[in-house]
Amino acid sequence: MSGNSFGRAFVLTSFGESHGAAIGGIIDGCPARIAIDSKEIQKELDRRKPARSAYVSSRREADEIHLFSGIFEGQTTGTPIGFVIQNCDQRSDDYAPFKAQFRPSHADYTYQKKYGIRDYRGGGRASARETAVRVTGGAIAKAVLQQLCAIKVRAYLSQIGCHRLAFESWQAVSSNPFSCPNQHQLSVIAQYLEDIQRRGNSVGTEITVVAEQVPAGLGEPVFDRLDADIAKALMSINAVKAVAIGDGFTSANQYGSMFRDERTARDGFLSNHAGGILGGISSGQTIVASAVFKPTSSIPIPAKSVDQNGDDCIISVRGRHDPCVGLRAVPIVEAMVSLTLCDHLLRQRGQNGQR
């Protein structure tokens, strides 16, 4: 198993490299007669693509989606959905110095050890360029979730560096390039990122994702728990180093009398510390999860490393890189949670019918 496919009932298989001719994917298991609007898929891709602001990579990719199978007259046919996205703005010469050198905290060294060969141009398969495929698959999964159960998956930037961002409204999230949940901290974020860029450094982030209208009963105990699969989905995204469900790591500071989500016949659940999942199965509450993205190591500040011969070297990474990879990660996080929920929804219906 090569690890390029995700899901069991709704399966996305991804292919392509950062500086190859194209990237793309195949979706197998999508139900028939799901309305698909290619413009809506393109909107999702436009949210992820580079060069959207001064604070992300200046690589200019149109990210135009080409759907070539599985959709007829605007509806899915139940057969595999194939799509491809051309790579048009590669600058492979920027990576020539790293043909024989390993960039710190990148996949260069581990890919070389695993395969004995690696595509050093833009990180090859390990590049975040691959996530455009996930966003495409996630857009189709969103259509399935919306049309079958009215499930809505949205995410926002909840922390950047030392700045915790208070949630104000979804309208605020969609009205700025940072996916910041409130208008009051926008100038602080902008100034903070400018300072980071000026110093030639980078910074980490946290993205919070919320899934509403998820029916109770999704999840397969014990090894395919819904929260376990969400964690796997989010951890599979480039640069993610931690995942939390519900209150997550802050649960360690709480008492059972506080954390337990009590409920009454009249009001239902009185809290949602568990993040909408109990015993690995959705409870019918809103599902809440978060993913922490490390600061990218593609920065001009010199760093110690070694080359393929095992000799010491000094590396300074220049070119078109994100000072904060989390800024473009919001639609990717949404996509992976949507893929997970879609997979579990179809598995639940296949096993237990529509309840």
Curated annotation (Swiss-Prot):
Cofactor dependency: FMNH2
- Which residues hold NADP(+)? 48
Q: Which InterPro entries would you find in this protein's record? A: Chorismate_synth, Chorismate_synth_AroC_sf, Chorismate_synthase_CS
Q: What does this protein do?
A: This reaction introduces a second double bond into the aromatic ring system.
Instruction: State how the cofactor is bound.
Output: Reduced FMN (FMNH(2)).
Swiss-Prot/TrEMBL catalytic activity: 5-O-(1-carboxyvinyl)-3-phosphoshikimate = chorismate + phosphate
Name the chain's protein: Chorismate synthase
Check the record and name the PROSITE patterns matching this protein.
Answer: CHORISMATE_SYNTHASE_1, CHORISMATE_SYNTHASE_2, CHORISMATE_SYNTHASE_3
Give the taxonomic lineage as stored in the record: Bacteria, Pseudomonadati, Pseudomonadota, Gammaproteobacteria, Cardiobacteriales
A Gene Ontology biological process term = amino acid biosynthetic process
Origin organism of this chain?
Dichelobacter nodosus (strain VCS1703A)
Q: Which GO terms describe its cellular component?
A: cytosol
Q: What class of enzyme is it?
A: lyase
Point out the gene that encodes the protein: aroC
The UniProt similarity line reads: Belongs to the chorismate synthase family.
